[in-house]
Regions:
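Long, composition-driven mixed-charge/polar low-complexity segments
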Residues: 1-5, 10-200
Length: 200
């Protein structure tokens, strides 16, 4: 079993929130014990919202999720159109009026946890990933430039070298448009520019 609510205590000496679950897992300071497996369809950790005694709240899912960008992010409202704006608008109602020093420390901790996540472990987790991309998941109007490989992933059977795919940075994925589409957006292609990509 996995908890659906627990307590966090702020340790002023280490400037960290310590999770305490006296009911289900009976653990202190073991945040990785709270996340149910992805195979459990009736209990998933899409959102972890922490509430403080002053009525403020914040999203701390990154603190507890093992694969936030690869798995959890796809189950959240932010992946829908304007879902990110909606969630920010909702959470703004619970925002603390005056930020404390520990809020900045917590922001840095959550950003560090997200950065430490590393590469996804399977091909499907690269689809829609905010930091990494595979060429097979690009849309017809997207192109990778420059083609700087971040690593490789094996797709298919182990040991087969023809199934090795390069991993690229999501920041190197660019949207391309036809001359007509650029014209409709109020822009014009300069005569000296070369065509980078053809769509057939």
């Amino acid at each position: 079993m996995y908890p659906i609510y627990w307590v966090e205590a702020f340790d002023e000496a280490t400037q960290k929130w310590i999770p305490v679950d006296p009911l289900v897992t009976k653990t202190v300071g073991k945040s990785r014990k709270f996340e149910p497996p992805m195979s459990d369809s009736e209990n998933n950790m899409s959102y972890v919202i922490s509430f403080e005694d002053d009525g403020s709240a914040r999203d701390v899912t990154k603190r507890y999720a093992k694969a936030y960008n690869a798995k959890i992010r796809k189950t959240r409202v932010e992946v829908t159109t304007d879902g990110d704006k909606w969630l920010k608008r909702v959470m703004k109602m619970y925002k603390r009026l005056h930020r404390l020093d520990r809020d900045q420390v917590e922001d840095a901790e959550l950003a560090r946890k997200e950065a430490q996540e590393g590469l996804p472990r399977n091909v499907q987790d690269f689809k829609g990933h905010p930091y990494y991309a595979l060429e097979r998941h690009l849309r017809s109007h997207e192109v990778i430039h420059p083609e700087r490989e971040m690593g490789n992933i094996y797709a298919g059977r182990a040991g087969s070298e023809k199934n090795v795919e390069p991993i690229y940075r999501r920041g190197d994925v660019h949207v391309v448009r036809s001359a007509d589409r650029w014209y409709r957006l109020g822009r014009e292609i300069m005569a000296s520019f070369l065509i980078m990509y053809h769509v057939y």
